[in-house]
Amino acid sequence: AMAISSVLLLGAARFLPALQRDSLTSTRKLALEDEIWLRVFTVAKHLQRAGYCHGSCTGEGLEIVGQGDCVIVQWDANSNGIWDREPVKESDQIGFRLKEHVLETLRGATSCEGKGWDKVTNPDAIIIDTFQVVRQDVSGFSPVLTVNMRAASKSEPQTVVNASYSVTGFNL
């Protein structure tokens, strides 16, 4: 009985650290997935609103720049019939871009260049490899806008998450 107990105890002593390590790895991957999906859904919600105007707005509701790694969205948030540019804090434009493996945003964005962009992801924890918005136009229908994002954990680069989400641009 003592020998059997010793064998079981040694087996458990070997198994427990591996179980804890796998549990920690799974928890980190889930946290990374949650973070990336939250960002993808946020961008997609803005894309879905792009072009909305309760009046006669001028300009394009959506501007996809470069390879889709920067987008500028306009929509009439206060339904006053125009796309407000001033004051910047209440501007109807918002931009998202990938710069140096960080997703950034700027309220009142007019181009994808310049300073003043706020980091949306933490560069000390997450490396964004890919951020891309793709527009697919289908004759007779509203365009389909797809947000693609690929990210890795900075502490564990082998932990990678891919996310892709599509919305319809009804106002475009």
Tell where the protein language model's regions lie, with residue ranges.
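Short linear sequence signals and composition-biased patches located at protein termini or domain-edge surfaces
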Residues: 114-172
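Aliphatic-rich helix starts adjacent to a transmembrane/signal segment
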Residues: 1-48
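Generic detector of ordered secondary-structure context
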Residues: 34-35, 88, 159
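Short, hydrophobic secondary-structure boundary micro-motifs
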Residues: 8, 55-56
